[in-house]
A protein has these predicted regions:
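Periplasmic solute-binding protein
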Residues: 1-29, 54-85, 182-189, 262-272
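Non-transmembrane alpha-helical segments in soluble domains
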Residues: 9, 14, 32-39, 70, ...
Length: 295
């Protein structure tokens, strides 16, 4: 891809964590233990929850919830099952996918855990993903799962750094040794084979261009020649380091690889219905399975 983003990020307030003695989790179980701990610690604080979330995005409402599911399929079922799921070698309602979705539901459908500073779990469906993480700045939410590009959504003047107002940590795998990584990106397409077009395309795939663009700011790149130290921010530097980590098991955003009827259709709407409590996990996943094109 020309540019890339890391989706396996959890945004948080380093200061709030330090004040409460919370540590960045290293495993999924650690994350769930931390979630329960925060819920217990804040039960007397009206409106404060461990997590905040938002999946509203106009005609694309639901896509942030699909990212959650993809991250958990990659973690709980593994890369091989993830690949088979994306290519429909296993059905959308396979038991492994049901399990992964229910793991997401352990957070997003639990009113004790969401939606900090906003409402209950169903408010997630009407909260813009752009606004979903902002309660962290108000102290009414402690964590928000969203990609590296969310850095641009924080209000002007927000200190985004390891010791600042907000930062991000890697969404942990099931064990500390595993490093599944959900990614996304944009691609360059050539519509002519003229020499000058090929020359531009070759240049845009070079380490020189990637390093120059990363240094300008606001983006990351999966180009292996990129020097992470050239990144314009600490978050983007962390994203590049994760993309280049030889121990990471990286996979591209699954919904982007699925047929559009599913990846940009029934998967989005199905997850929105699920968040709204209209359908349970198996019903939603079966509906999505039945929407998969036969040819």
């Amino acid at each position: 891809p020309l540019m890339a983003s890391v989706k396996s990020f959890v945004w948080y307030s380093p200061g709030a964590f330090a004040d409460k003695g919370y540590e960045v989790p290293e495993t999924w179980d650690d994350l769930m233990t931390l979630t329960k701990k925060i819920a217990d610690d804040t039960k007397d604080e009206s409106g404060t929850k461990p997590w905040c979330a938002g999946i509203e995005s106009g005609g694309a409402t639901g896509w942030p919830a699909t990212d959650w599911v993809e991250d958990l399929v990659l973690r709980s079922a593994g890369a091989d099952a993830y690949d088979k799921w994306v290519t429909h070698e296993i059905p959308f309602n396979d038991p492994e996918i049901v399990k992964a979705t229910d793991l997401v539901g352990n957070i997003l459908l639990d009113d004790d855990y969401v939606n900090g500073g906003i409402g209950d779990s169903r408010s997630i469906a009407t909260t813009s993903f752009n606004d979903g993480g902002l309660p962290i700045l108000e102290g009414s939410c402690y964590m928000y799962r969203m990609a590296s590009f969310y850095e641009a959504q924080w209000p002007e003047g927000t200190d985004v750094s390891p010791d600042g107002d907000v930062f991000a940590f890697y969404l942990p795998g099931m064990t500390a040794d595993e490093k599944p990584l959900l990614t996304a990106g944009e691609f360059v397409g050539a519509f002519s084979d003229r020499p000058e077009v090929q020359a531009v395309q070759q240049y845009m795939s070079s380490g020189l261009w990637a390093n120059t663009r990363v240094e300008i700011g606001g983006v990351t790149s999966a180009n292996k020649a990129v020097d992470a130290s050239k990144a314009s921010s600490d978050v983007l530097r962390l994203a590049i380091e994760l993309l280049q980590d030889p121990d990471a098991t990286a996979r591209f955003d699954g919904s982007d690889l699925m047929p559009s009827e599913v990846g940009a259709g029934s998967f989005w709407t199905g997850m929105t219905q699920w968040i709204n409590g209209e359908k349970d996990t198996e019903t939603v996943l079966t509906d999505i399975e039945n929407s998969w094109p036969t040819s």
